[in-house]
């Protein structure tokens, strides 16, 4: 009979530390994706690792209310509250999409007390890409 090989550093022996507690990033990037149906706010560190995120759906808004400016404002406030507690002071803002929550999310970010380096619109624009559908004849 062979003896089982002892596991070195198994989960029971080692202490698992969460990444959220160790994050002390003074600078971050706030990504706002505003579609017509929802607004998603993601806060990352400069390397692109997600520190915090929130959306209008996770804030409790259902159906068509997720696309409203108030829902976007609430989502931005929830996402930023967590990183302000961790010590974030400066941020860059990237806004993507045509939704109603663009301006409301930006106002909530400005009100949170984080200093903004710049605000950039990164909405993808086609350079005459796909052919549009044919015109409707009614």
UniProtKB/Swiss-Prot annotation:
Question: Which keywords does this chain's UniProt record carry?
Answer: Chloroplast, Plastid, Ribonucleoprotein, Ribosomal protein, RNA-binding, rRNA-binding
Q: Where in the cell is it found?
A: Plastid, Chloroplast
Write out the ranges of the annotated region (Disordered).
1-22
Any one Gene Ontology MF annotation carried by this entry is: rRNA binding
GO biological process, alphabetically ordered? translation
Origin superkingdom? Eukaryota
One Gene Ontology cellular component annotation held by this UniProt entry: ribonucleoprotein complex
Task: Enumerate the InterPro entries for this protein.
Answer: Ribosomal_uS11, Ribosomal_uS11_bac-type, Ribosomal_uS11_CS, Ribosomal_uS11_sf
Compositionally biased spans, kind Basic residues: 9-22
**NCBIfam families (alphabetical):** PRK05309.1, uS11_bact
Q: How does it assemble?
A: Part of the 30S ribosomal subunit.
Q: Would you identify the family this protein belongs to, as annotated? A: Belongs to the universal ribosomal protein uS11 family.
**Designated name of the protein:** Small ribosomal subunit protein uS11c
This chain's source organism reads: Nymphaea alba (White water-lily)
Gene symbol here is rps11
């Amino acid at each position: 009979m062979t003896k089982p090989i002892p596991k070195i550093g198994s989960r029971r022996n080692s202490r698992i530390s969460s990444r959220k507690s160790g994050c002390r990033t003074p600078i971050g990037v706030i990504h706002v994706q505003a579609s017509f149906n929802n607004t998603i706010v993601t806060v990352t560190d400069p390397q692109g690792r997600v520190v915090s995120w929130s959306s209008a759906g996770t804030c409790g808004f259902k159906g068509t209310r997720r696309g409203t400016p108030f829902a976007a404002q609430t989502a931005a406030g929830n996402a930023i509250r967590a990183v302000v507690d961790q010590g974030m002071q400066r941020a860059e803002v990237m806004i993507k999409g045509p939704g109603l929550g663009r301006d409301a999310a930006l106002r909530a970010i400005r009100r949170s007390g984080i200093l903004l380096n710049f605000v950039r619109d990164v909405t993808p624009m086609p350079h005459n890409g796909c052919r549009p559908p044919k015109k409707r004849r009614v």
